[in-house]
From Swiss-Prot:
Pfam families hit by this protein: VAPB_antitox
Lineage of the species this protein comes from: Archaea, Methanobacteriati, Methanobacteriota, Stenosarchaea group, Methanomicrobia
Name used for this protein in its record: Putative antitoxin MM_2475
Described purpose of this protein according to its UniProt entry: Possibly the antitoxin component of a type II toxin-antitoxin (TA) system.
NCBIfam families: PRK13696.1-1
Keyword DNA repair recorded: no
Keywords: Toxin-antitoxin system
Family that this chain belongs to: Belongs to the UPF0330 family.
Record's signal peptide: none
Organism of origin: Methanosarcina mazei (strain ATCC BAA-159 / DSM 3647 / Goe1 / Go1 / JCM 11833 / OCM 88)
Length: 79
């Protein structure tokens, strides 16, 4: 596997080092553990299980975003 060299502050290095669970862990292991690939919302929801309050909040946010996109704003009106 190819490697890359990055510069990080001493504080960032110490934080990463403190997250290693064993001497065998690499910094790549730590980074991948705490910053996994992007997941689909459906994967996250399946993992946390049923949560009606969260479902209602997501539905409301989705409706609000659609309404905001449909609004036609005339930016030249004040010119």
């Amino acid at each position: 596997m190819p490697t890359r060299t990055i510069s990080i502050s001493e504080e960032a290095y110490e934080r990463l080092k403190s997250l290693k669970t064993s001497e065998k862990d690499s910094f790549s292991d730590v980074i991948l553990k705490y910053y996994p690939r992007k997941r689909k919302l459906s994967e996250v929801l399946a993992e946390i299980g049923s949560n009606p309050e969260l479902a209602d909040a997501i539905e409301k946010a989705s409706r609000d975003m659609r309404k905001a996109k449909m609004r036609n704003v005339d930016l030249d009106a004040g010119a």
